């Protein structure tokens, strides 16, 4: 299920555009996640008071967390599938502390694709979308495998 060198290049090309505004992209991804899948908000105690999209847009904490999420994802993507060292602590915290189900990682992956399509349509055509989908699926599968090792049924 690995990606070719060309596919990784497509992923990293668009990711360079994300890195130019990690906070803005991250905020948009989290708002999209919470609007599309409101049940995911239950996993974020510090965001439970954010009832409207306006509240979410005004939250510096949400913007910061979005930046954190996409920074971590970018570090993993740049490893081009050789990300075991980066996945381990992420899986550990998301399984044991945050209890984030793999399904929620699928949800956020879908939102990431949508945000990239909207913000970078010229650089995120069908080939790049397919490559990013594969990269995010690889990430989720590896997280799910670590979850299983940790005994988390998420």
Swiss-Prot record:
Q: Which EC number(s) are documented for this chain?
A: 1.7.-.-, 1.11.1.-
What Pfam families does the annotation carry?
A: Globin (PF00042)
Q: Which SUPFAM superfamilies match?
A: Globin-like
Indicate whether Flavoprotein appears among the record's keywords: no
User: Which InterPro entries does the entry mention?
Assistant: Globin, Globin-like_sf, Myoglobin
GO biological process, alphabetically ordered = brown fat cell differentiation; enucleate erythrocyte differentiation; heart development; removal of superoxide radicals; response to hormone; response to hydrogen peroxide; response to hypoxia; slow-twitch skeletal muscle fiber contraction
Subunit architecture: Monomeric.
Q: Which family does it belong to?
A: Belongs to the globin family.
Protein name per its UniProtKB record: Myoglobin
List the gene name: Mb
């Amino acid at each position: 299920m690995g990606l070719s060198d060309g596919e990784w290049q497509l992923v990293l090309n668009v990711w360079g555009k994300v890195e130019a505004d990690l906070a803005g992209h991250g905020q948009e991804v989290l708002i999209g996640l919470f609007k599309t899948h409101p049940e995911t908000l239950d996993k974020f105690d510090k965001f439970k008071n954010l009832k409207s999209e306006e509240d979410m847009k005004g939250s510096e904490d949400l913007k910061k967390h979005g930046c954190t999420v996409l920074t971590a994802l970018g570090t993993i993507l740049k490893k081009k599938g050789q990300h075991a060292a980066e996945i381990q602590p992420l899986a550990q915290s998301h399984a044991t502390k945050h209890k984030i189900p793999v399904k929620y990682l699928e949800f956020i992956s879908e939102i990431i694709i949508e945000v990239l399509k909207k913000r970078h349509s010229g650089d995120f055509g069908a080939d790049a979308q397919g490559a990013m989908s594969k990269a995010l699926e690889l990430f989720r599968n590896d997280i799910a495998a670590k979850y299983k090792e940790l005994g988390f049924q998420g």
